[in-house]
UniProtKB/Swiss-Prot annotation:
Keywords: Riboflavin biosynthesis, Transferase. Its EC number is 2.5.1.78. Belongs to the DMRL synthase family. It holds the Pfam family DMRL_synthase. One of its GO terms (molecular function) is 6,7-dimethyl-8-ribityllumazine synthase activity. Catalyzes the formation of 6,7-dimethyl-8-ribityllumazine by condensation of 5-amino-6-(D-ribitylamino)uracil with 3,4-dihydroxy-2-butanone 4-phosphate. This is the penultimate step in the biosynthesis of riboflavin. It catalyses: (2S)-2-hydroxy-3-oxobutyl phosphate + 5-amino-6-(D-ribitylamino)uracil = 6,7-dimethyl-8-(1-D-ribityl)lumazine + phosphate + 2 H2O + H(+). This is 6,7-dimethyl-8-ribityllumazine synthase. (2S)-2-hydroxy-3-oxobutyl phosphate binds at S85, T86, R127. GO terms for biological process: riboflavin biosynthetic process. NCBIfam families: lumazine-synth, PRK00061.1-4. The keyword Nucleotidyltransferase does not apply.
Length: 153
């Protein structure tokens, strides 16, 4: 029986990051966490490209273009959606999640979901480098591992 695992070595891997501008005071921290983690695991900063989009809803299209380009081993999607007083939150969260998941399945490229979906600003801040760690960093680890798992198949 074969057991296939992915290591956390990012040397010579190329990463695309799609980051939403809306709620950038949170997303900047997610992006910094992702880049720092990729570099700490061997990626070169010159092998990391970041595309900024208006908001979480726009992430899937740019993620798809990056994944289809053949330039990237993985794409990391970062954003923050904070619940407000309308149903807009539900639509944005659902469509971003479905779109990002579909890109990975359609292209065969690991596309990592790093869009925070929180009830309030405090929860978002906690997940961007305080009490609950940095989800951008966690997504970078997931991207590295998935690339290496796929290489082992």
């Amino acid at each position: 029986m074969a057991i296939i695992t992915g290591n956390l070595v990012a040397t010579e891997l190329k990463f695309g990051i799609v980051c939403a501008r809306f709620n950038d005071f949170i997303n900047d921290k997610l992006l910094s966490g992702a880049i720092d983690t990729l570099v700490r695991h061997g990626a070169s900063e010159s092998d990391i490209d970041t595309a900024w989009v208006p908001g979480a809803f726009e992430i899937p299209l740019v993620a798809k273009k990056m994944a289809e380009s053949g330039k990237y081993d993985a794409v990391i999607c970062l954003g923050t959606v904070i619940r407000g007083s309308t149903t807009h939150y539900d639509y944005v969260c659902n469509e971003a999640a479905k779109g990002i998941g579909a890109v990975s399945l359609q292209t065969g490229v690991p596309v990592i979901f790093g869009v925070l979906t929180t009830e309030n600003i405090e929860q978002a801040i906690e997940r961007a480098g305080t009490k609950a760690g940095n989800k951008g960093s966690e997504c970078a680890l997931g991207a590295i591992e998935m690339v290496n798992v796929l290489k082992g198949l």
